[in-house]
């Protein structure tokens, strides 16, 4: 029930805020279903890999698919400082950000966190 509104969200967010030249979402090659159980976390990383001739990821979009509440598991973005995105813990919520932004998922302290990740690609940045 969330996937089509999520795709609309991705397209609208890119058009209104980022303006990146993207390949059609119908050519998506990578969706990732993430399951974070109690005690798991994902350390700091970026999704875009500089100077990679194959990957041209520009935007990362995440959709929270959890149907039950969980504790911990905050998404944290790092630009000039850490930004904790606790609003993303609400089921059905979505977030989109440039794939070159460093981010992590804090440790789940109870419950299970389920998300869908879409990486949107386009021609290389100039």
What annotation goes with each model-predicted range?
Residues 1-94, 100-126:
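Fe(II)/2-oxoglutarate oxygenase catalytic core
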